[in-house]
UniProtKB/Swiss-Prot annotation:
GO term, biological process aspect, one: translation
HAMAP family reported for this sequence: Ribosomal_uL30_B (MF_01371_B)
Pfam families: Ribosomal_L30
PANTHER family reported in the protein's UniProt record: LARGE RIBOSOMAL SUBUNIT PROTEIN UL30M, MITOCHONDRIAL RIBOSOMAL PROTEIN L30
GO molecular function, a single term: structural constituent of ribosome
Family per similarity comment: Belongs to the universal ribosomal protein uL30 family.
Assembly: Part of the 50S ribosomal subunit.
Name used for this protein in its record: Large ribosomal subunit protein uL30
Cellular compartments per GO CC: cytosolic large ribosomal subunit
Signal peptide: none
Organism of this sequence: Buchnera aphidicola subsp. Acyrthosiphon kondoi
Keyword entries, A-Z: Ribonucleoprotein, Ribosomal protein
Stored InterPro entries: Ribo_uL30_ferredoxin-like_sf, Ribosomal_uL30_bac-type, Ribosomal_uL30_CS, Ribosomal_uL30_ferredoxin-like
Length: 59
């Protein structure tokens, strides 16, 4: 079974770069406090790295 990680949005996307907003939507995050569980892949890690200042990650 693939390893999964939990990603939670902790800061607002208002006033952020359009690319960063699109990345949050790509992660499946819609609002502050929203948590999603995703398969841990290099592509996902790259997305998280881009918006690391707006999300919290749990292994």
């Amino acid at each position: 079974m693939a390893k999964t990680i939990k990603v939670t949005q902790v800061r607002s996307s208002i006033g952020r770069l359009p690319k960063h907003k699109a990345t949050l939507l790509g992660l499946g995050l819609r609002r502050i406090g929203h948590t999603v569980e995703r398969e841990d892949t290099p592509a996902l890690r790259g997305m998280i790295n881009l918006v690391s200042y707006m999300v919290k990650v749990e292994e």
